[in-house]
Amino acid sequence: MATHTEQLTRPAVRLQGLTRSFADRTVLDGIDLDLPAGQFTALLGHSGSGKSTLLRAVAGLDHEVTGSGQLTAPERVSVVFQDSRLLPWRRVLDNVLLGTDGKEAAERGRAALAEVGLAGRERAWPGELSGGEAQRAALARSLVREPELLLADEPFGALDALTRIRMHTLLRELWERHRPSVLLVTHDVDEAIVLADRVLVLERGRIGLDLTIDRPHPRSYRDPLLGEYRERLLTALGVTEHQGAQEDHQ
C-alpha cells in the first residue's frame, strides 16, 4: 500500500486550461491545477467567483467546460453538498446505499453510519434527523463508495456554529482514516485554515493564491500562529482584518 508521502507525488486531479463561460461572462479562465492524491485542499473565493463551478467541473457534472480535465479514478468520486440531499421517502440506511449494490453494501453502509456517529439510526427517516445528523448521513453516503476523491461544496454552511465545529472534527478524522483527496469549497477562511493543508483562492477566474498551511493537527481557531495565514488569505480576498471580524459575527 502506498504511503501518504508517496500518494502526494501523483495527482488525483489535473486540470489544464480549464475554461467556463456563462453568456458573456468568463467564470473560469484557463485554470491549471493539480490536486495530489491524498491531499486536503480548500477553495476560497467571493460569492459568484466560480468555486462551485470549478467543483462541478472536477466532478464531471458540467459538460460545457473547455480545456482538459483528467481524473485518475472518476468512478470513485463522491460529492457532498450544503443540502444533505437525503430522499425523504427512504430510510437513512437506504439513502446511504443509493447507487451501491452487492452483498456487502448493507454492511458497509452500517459501518459508515457508525463511523459518523449514527449507529442505531439506520431505520430513521431523514425528517427525524437534525441538520448536523443529516450531514453526517451525507458523509456516510460518500464514504460507502470508498472514494479516492471527495468533493465538498459548502457542506456545513447551513449549520449552527457549534455543530460546524463538531463536523470539522469529524471530517478531518474521516480524512485521516481514509486518506481520499479532498476539495472543500467554503467561504469561511477559518474553516479552511483549520481543516486544510493547502488553501486556494479563486480570483477573476484564476487561482490568485496557492497557500500551504504548515501547522500540525488538530488545529485550534485560537492558535495565534494561524493569524499570519488568515491575514494572507483575507488580503487575497480583498478583505481587511476588521471587515473579516465583522463578517464572522454577522
Curated annotation (Swiss-Prot):
It comes from the Bacteria. Its EC number is 7.6.2.14. One of its GO terms (cellular component) is plasma membrane. ATP binds at residues 45-52. Keywords: ATP-binding, Cell membrane, Membrane, Nucleotide-binding, Translocase, Transport. InterPro entries: AAA+_ATPase, ABC_transporter-like_ATP-bd, ABC_transporter-like_CS, ABC_transporter_ATP-bind, P-loop_NTPase. It is an enzyme of class 7 (translocase). GO terms for molecular function: ATP binding; ATP hydrolysis activity. It catalyses: ATP + H2O + aliphatic sulfonate-[sulfonate-binding protein]Side 1 = ADP + phosphate + aliphatic sulfonateSide 2 + [sulfonate-binding protein]Side 1. It is found in: Cell membrane. SMART domains: AAA. The complex is composed of two ATP-binding proteins (SsuB), two transmembrane proteins (SsuC) and a solute-binding protein (SsuA). Belongs to the ABC transporter superfamily. Aliphatic sulfonates importer (TC 3.A.1.17.2) family. This is Aliphatic sulfonates import ATP-binding protein SsuB 2. The gene is ssuB2.
